[in-house]
Amino acid sequence: MTSIKFYQSFSAHLVQHSPWPILVSFSLFNLAIGTVLTMHGYSHSSTTFDLGLAVTVGSILLWTRDIVIEGSFLGDHTKQVQEGLIIGFILFIISEVFAFISVFWAYFHSALSPAVELGSTWPPVGIIPLDTFSLPLFNTIILLSSGAFVTYGHHAIFSGKRLDSIIGLFLTVALALIFSYFQAFEYIHAGFSMSDSVFGTVFFASTGLHGIHVMLGTLFLFVSFLRQVNYQTTKEHNIGLETSILYWHFVDLVWLFLFLVVYFWGGA
């Protein structure tokens, strides 16, 4: 660790070229195309979807492996590289904000001025929305609790309480998996589908987009948990953990807005 700190004190950019960003971009595009084709019932569309999903997941895992090797074993994450990672993460969050803005825009566009075909009311005639204060409220408590535990684990690292930090990260990942399970349970037992008017479309699009981000954030936090277990995170060397925690708080904030708008206000 001493030699890694020594090399990381230099301002040179040591990270080599990586194929994973471009591979993830193309595989995500392929996954999106496969999703659309599958929803429209095109033949062999599931092959496109499965291929896109497999390449995306594989590329993300291999990308994560390379980052861990570069940062923890090779000492390639110098000050300049760390600054680049932080700037890249900020740009990533900004792009995510605009992605959710587009979804909420679609929701408000339909909800604030319902079309005549929908009965000029929101939710549309014939749609029975989910009970806000049952499973959605329970999921909200779970997700916000996970945010509290990840903050506890974060502070434990800087306080030198390694075991407490591991427990905090473990509970965060566990609660994230529970949230995803109940979200899937909610989808299965919902009284409407994505094809049931624009209400179903924007509901599943907004909550589904958030669900994808929950799964991605769970992966980030699980990697941070494993790195903490293997003594790869310190007070000075924690860019991956910091960005994972900030991303998780972003996911928490988006869900809180989703709960208030889609479930509480939109489902009333």
Curated annotation (Swiss-Prot):
Component of the cytochrome c oxidase, the last enzyme in the mitochondrial electron transport chain which drives oxidative phosphorylation. The respiratory chain contains 3 multisubunit complexes succinate dehydrogenase (complex II, CII), ubiquinol-cytochrome c oxidoreductase (cytochrome b-c1 complex, complex III, CIII) and cytochrome c oxidase (complex IV, CIV), that cooperate to transfer electrons derived from NADH and succinate to molecular oxygen, creating an electrochemical gradient over the inner membrane that drives transmembrane transport and the ATP synthase. It comes from the Eukaryota. The chain crosses the membrane at residues 19-39, 49-69, 85-105, 124-144, 165-185, 202-222, 245-265. It holds the Pfam family COX3. PANTHER family: CYTOCHROME C OXIDASE SUBUNIT 3 (PTHR11403:SF7), CYTOCHROME C OXIDASE SUBUNIT III (PTHR11403). One of its GO terms (molecular function) is cytochrome-c oxidase activity. Its main location: mitochondrion. Its EC number is 7.1.1.9. Keywords: Membrane, Mitochondrion, Mitochondrion inner membrane, Translocase, Transmembrane, Transmembrane helix. The keyword Nucleus does not apply. This is Cytochrome c oxidase subunit 3. Gene3D superfamilies: 1.10.287.70, Cytochrome c oxidase, subunit III, four-helix bundle (1.20.120.80). It is found in: Mitochondrion inner membrane. It catalyses: 4 Fe(II)-[cytochrome c] + O2 + 8 H(+)(in) = 4 Fe(III)-[cytochrome c] + 2 H2O + 4 H(+)(out). Component of the cytochrome c oxidase (complex IV, CIV), a multisubunit enzyme composed of a catalytic core of 3 subunits and several supernumerary subunits. The complex exists as a monomer or a dimer and forms supercomplexes (SCs) in the inner mitochondrial membrane with ubiquinol-cytochrome c oxidoreductase (cytochrome b-c1 complex, complex III, CIII). It is an enzyme of class 7 (translocase). It is a multi-pass membrane protein. One of its GO terms (cellular component) is mitochondrial inner membrane. Belongs to the cytochrome c oxidase subunit 3 family. One of its GO terms (biological process) is mitochondrial electron transport, cytochrome c to oxygen.
